Design a protein with these regions (language model features):
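Intrinsically disordered, low-complexity segments enriched in small/polar residues
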Residues: 20-31, 35-157
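Sec-dependent bacterial lipoprotein signal peptides
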Residues: 1-19
Length: 157
């Protein structure tokens, strides 16, 4: 596990140093006749002044031979239509009305330098509402949610 994290960290540093600006996002679409609720659960981190709330992807601080580094991710929501975002107890909850969709992108911040990255892990993804589907841009991966509600783990790189 530690080796995997170290490899991911080294790849991330190399990509950040090369000026990686590739935005990764996914779209949640509501194909049902009733609203759906999407919730992301993270460990909240103190928000910096003038910035969006931060949520931990991995333990906030990890010691490595290269020194201390932070795994932090800032979630940015781009609603297509109206969406209600509720941030409570480390949860970002989005309620979508029928025929609406939500685009969510993520950004990493490392050593004070923000860089779009290619790897993220959503620790918990909860969707409520039959007929919801998840399209992942760029990866050609589609997950269909046919149950009324459930908890899913999503990983992509």
């Amino acid at each position: 596990m530690h080796n995997r994290l170290l490899i991911a960290f080294l790849i991330f540093v190399a990509a950040a140093g090369a000026g990686c600006t590739s935005e990764r996002s996914f779209v949640i679409k509501n194909g049902s006749a009733s609203p759906i609720v999407v919730a992301y659960q993270f460990a909240p981190l103190p928000a910096k002044e003038g910035s969006a709330p931060m949520y931990a992807m991995h333990p906030p601080e990890t010691e490595s031979p290269e020194g201390r580094w932070n795994w932090e991710t800032r979630w940015i929501a781009f609603p297509e239509g109206q969406a209600t975002v509720d941030r409570q107890q480390g949860t970002v909850r989005v309620t979508l009305d029928p025929a609406q969709s939500l685009r969510v992108a993520h950004a990493f911040e490392y050593a004070g330098q923000e860089s779009w990255d290619f790897q993220v892990r959503i620790t918990r993804l909860t969707m409520t509402g039959a007929g919801a589907q998840l399209d992942m841009a760029g990866d050609q991966v589609r997950l269909a949610f046919v149950e009324s509600d459930g908890v899913y783990v999503l990983e992509y790189r």
